[in-house]
Amino acid sequence: MRQSKFFMPTLKEAPSDAVAESHKLMIRGGYIRQVTAGVYAYLPLGYRVLRKAEGIIEDEMEKINVPEMIMPHLLPATLWQESGRYKKYGAEMFKLKDRHGRESLLGPTHEETFTEIIAKNLKSYKQMPLALYQIQTKFRDENRPRFGLLRGREFVMLDGYSFAATRDQLDEQFDDQKSAYKRIFKRAGVTVHPVIADSGTMGGKNSTEFQAPAAIGEDTIATNEKGTYAANLEMAKSIDTFKQEPEDAKELTKVATPGCDTIEKLAKFLNVPATRIVKSILYIADDQKVLVLIRGDKQINEVKLGHVLDADEVHEADSADLKEITGSEKGGVGPVDADWADKIIADETVKDLYNVVVGAGETDYQFENANLDRDFKVDEFVDIRTANEGEPDPVDHLPLKFTTSIEVGHIFKLGTYYTKTMGADFLDQNGKAKPVIMGSYGIGVTRMLSAAVEQHLTEHGVAWPKEIAPFAIHIVQMKMNKEDQTELAEKLEKKFSEKYDVLYDDRKERAGVKFADADLVGAPIRITVGKKAADGIVEVKRPTDDKATEISIDELDKFVNQELG
């Protein structure tokens, strides 16, 4: 490809509103251009990278015998209403009506559509296990699109779905997909951690995220140094090392605590450590009033809490509801005589405490020396706390390390979450009707590209991993009016183009402009044809090299083959 004919509008400076380094690079390098908030056009350079990534996915899916197909962007609302996700998905769904008033949506994902097709066309256990996938543009009405391709309103995604007759088949499919995903990310040059994750609105109970460490990441993952434990902070577990020595129960005493509306203020006022205080927080789970208890030095993890309560809607009671239900304002709520609560659950940190401080059920009052069983009851003890960095992990008891990261993939064991609701049944070996068992698998392809840039930035540009680089070799000719340079550059272009994608900079530009653009292209190998062309000498440079190295054209083949394989 001749660069003089290649549309690559580069910029010296990134737009002022670009925050993520990947966003800045892709704008400056002429990879993408914004059309509207959260929506981008992929220019030739960006589209080449996108197609390379899609090619890796197609290759790896072929290896595990998963065929590709394509679904429509425009989906009927009725399918999502049937699954119950039409309302649950929330404001991020693009909804519209046609001229006849029929409701539709732009697909953010396609579980319902695949399930409907399977329900109509898969009837016997003999047709399973089966898996399908597509690479397609998705839509999400982000409230605040930002960070370029990392959080857009339109994005490219691989979404795949598996269908099984037994749990064993699902487990095998899940493992195959997980292995394929690891290979995809490795080939794309993106370092990832497979981590325990929350399924969110997707349904199902078991899921694994693929998180790419990056400074701009919006997620936090907790790992140990051996790599034997990794989880999204939303689901991370840790070992609580605090132990209170047993004490004899003291007399329950009510004390005034004016203005102590935080744990810090209360601990200071009563001159007790936060570990001596039990926080009581009222949550509304559908129509149930649930009082949640946790030790004062810990924080409630609402994702874990949501799993425990297993309700369609869970939220902390606001001040008006709190006053109406408990008779107290925030800080005074407590578990003693809390007959108004439908259920009281407590974090495991509350289990072995003695003579603690709890809300007295009255604004600005607390009970001292409250004891479990004597003064209040708990219906269930569960892990609902947020893990803290440095706490021991639950596997090898090593300190947890927190890292910001980008979610680039997510795989789920959906089970029968959709198929039961949507009537996707099959006949088993005994002729009995059973719901198909599903898995769901996704890679944010455009997110993966942003993650690759974030992980492979150089001082002046990017060092693309070789399998997704827009060009493998970038030939830069210094002076276009020198016949010896032109002759050698064209010879190298013809030779290497037989095996690799080659960009030949044949523009009549200054050397500084050419090198600056080459840094933004980020090809694994840059070959500079300059003043020693007549002697059969060129310069080679990798994006991570500090400076170029002279090499004879006789040795160039060996160098290229070593670098590109």
From Swiss-Prot:
A Pfam match: HGTP_anticodon
Enzyme class, broadest EC rank: ligase
Highest taxon listed in the record's lineage: Bacteria
Family: Belongs to the class-II aminoacyl-tRNA synthetase family. ProS type 1 subfamily.
Quaternary assembly: Homodimer.
Main location: cytoplasm
Catalytic reaction(s) noted: tRNA(Pro) + L-proline + ATP = L-prolyl-tRNA(Pro) + AMP + diphosphate
Protein name in UniProt: Proline--tRNA ligase
GO biological process: prolyl-tRNA aminoacylation
Localisation per UniProt entry: Cytoplasm
GO cellular component, one term: cytosol
EC number: 6.1.1.15
InterPro entries hit by this protein: aa-tRNA-synt_IIb, aa-tRNA-synth_II, aa-tRNA-synth_II/BPL/LPL, Anticodon-bd, Anticodon-bd_dom_sf, Pro-tRNA-ligase_IIa, Pro-tRNA-synth_IIa_bac-type, Pro-tRNA-Synthase_IIa_type1
Keyword annotations of the record: Aminoacyl-tRNA synthetase, ATP-binding, Cytoplasm, Ligase, Nucleotide-binding, Protein biosynthesis
Stated role: Catalyzes the attachment of proline to tRNA(Pro) in a two-step reaction: proline is first activated by ATP to form Pro-AMP and then transferred to the acceptor end of tRNA(Pro). As ProRS can inadvertently accommodate and process non-cognate amino acids such as alanine and cysteine, to avoid such errors it has two additional distinct editing activities against alanine. One activity is designated as 'pretransfer' editing and involves the tRNA(Pro)-independent hydrolysis of activated Ala-AMP.
GO molecular function: aminoacyl-tRNA deacylase activity; ATP binding; catalytic activity, acting on a protein; proline-tRNA ligase activity; transferase activity
Domain notes: Consists of three domains: the N-terminal catalytic domain, the editing domain and the C-terminal anticodon-binding domain.
PROSITE patterns associated with the record: AA_TRNA_LIGASE_II
